[in-house]
Amino acid sequence: MADGSGWQPPRPCEAYRAEWKLCRSARHFLHHYYVHGERPACEQWQRDLASCRDWEERRNAEAQQSLCESERARVRAARKHILVWAPRQSPPPDWHLPLPQEKDE
């Protein structure tokens, strides 16, 4: 990764442009504001797009490092949400019994 030969950005530059464009759309703004109560932060997508283009045009090592760090941060953010339910190893022992509302009838 130090010399950058053969290295490709994690996503094509067009993907960064599409994400930035989506982030700036009115529909995404309204959805994000409704769900999170704040404006969506689109600056990172714009920085990633600029870094990707800088890498493709000049093979800039700083742009490469910026893209790598940004993608790592995205992966960490996606992994930080834990499971709500613990996976079961086996079904409950009374799984075959009728449900409580079926007993009343």
Swiss-Prot record:
Function recorded in the entry: Negatively regulates long-term potentiation and modulates adult synaptic plasticity. Stabilizes the interaction of RTN4 isoform A/Nogo-A with its receptors, inhibiting clustering of postsynaptic AMPA receptors at synaptic sites. Upon neuronal stimulation, degraded at synapses, reducing RTN4 signaling and allowing AMPA receptor clustering at individual synapses.
Protein keywords: Secreted, Synapse
GO cellular component: mitochondrion; synapse; synaptic cleft
Compartments where located: Synapse; Synaptic cleft
Family listed: Belongs to the UPF0545 family.
One Pfam family recorded for the sequence: PANTS-like
PTM description: Rapidly degraded by proteolysis following neuronal stimulation, resulting in increased AMPA receptor clustering.
PANTHER family: UPF0545 PROTEIN C22ORF39 (PTHR28052:SF1)
Keyword Transport: no
Superkingdom classification of source: Eukaryota
Descriptive protein name: Synaptic plasticity regulator PANTS
SUBUNIT field: Interacts with RTN4 isoform A/Nogo-A; the interaction results in enhanced RTN4-mediated inhibition of AMPA receptor clustering. Also interacts with NCAM1, RANBP2 and CCT8.
Record's keyword annotation contains Lipid metabolism: no
GO biological process: negative regulation of long-term synaptic potentiation; regulation of synaptic plasticity
InterPro entries with a match to the protein in the record: Pants/Emi1-like
Main location: other
